[in-house]
Amino acid sequence: MNYKDQYKSKIQENLKNVTKELETRNMQLKISNWANKFGYSFGQIKEKIINDEIFRCVFAKDPAKQNLYQNLAAQYISSLDIVENFKVLPSGGKNAIYLTNGKILQGHLLKNQSKDIKSIDFVWTCNNLTFYASHKYTEVSGGAQDNQYKDIQDFLHHSRDCNEKNTIFLAICDGDYYLQKDSQTGDETKIKRLQRLTDNKTSFVLNIDSLSSFLQNITN
């Protein structure tokens, strides 16, 4: 899957939507706040948006903040013939699903658990197996990106102690970040470092392009 091309396509769509949304309350509030912040009138900014495509980019929504990468992954996984009962899980709340110390828990059961636990993104079934997946698309290095890397390591750590039968945990890691060397451990790539943390029996690390063949192999 080419996430970068999908991002470019979506951001062009969002750019076109700026002028379509000029009369909406949210856009007018955004323009008003921007105008007040920099000392311009509402009318000046609105006219500039209409006539200047480059300036219009300031007000276009960032696809990355619209769950683009998770949505693309969800569309792809759910389209696979072998996948059944696919669900995108809530990121929080009582119906979210968490993995902690080998236990799969819904949000309403987390009262006495650590608040740092990240929810699982997707769940589906194949044949008699249930798959729980954490998905990350991480492009460049940085503090926030390193936190995502740590989230995956924590997910794999918590999966080790799970004794649920016919249950598989997947860390789906996409983006150039995972192809970079891990300077702390010396691993050739970060994804190889993550793969060393799995037992390759009930937990696995892979990218989305290898998911289809992986599911075919593990369910045969």
PLM feature segments, named:
Residues 168-220:
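Domain-level recognition of nuclease-like catalytic cores that cleave nucleotide substrates
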Residues 101, 115-116, 143, 178:
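Glycine- and small hydrophobic-enriched segments that form the cores of compact globular domains
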Residues 1-71:
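Nuclease-adjacent, charged terminal/linker segments that flank catalytic cores
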Residues 52-56, 127-136:
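Glycine-rich, often proline-containing surface loops adjacent to acidic residues and nearby aromatics
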Residues 72-84, 155-163, 218:
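Hydrophobic, Leu/Ile/Phe/Ala-enriched alpha-helical segments that form helix-helix packing faces
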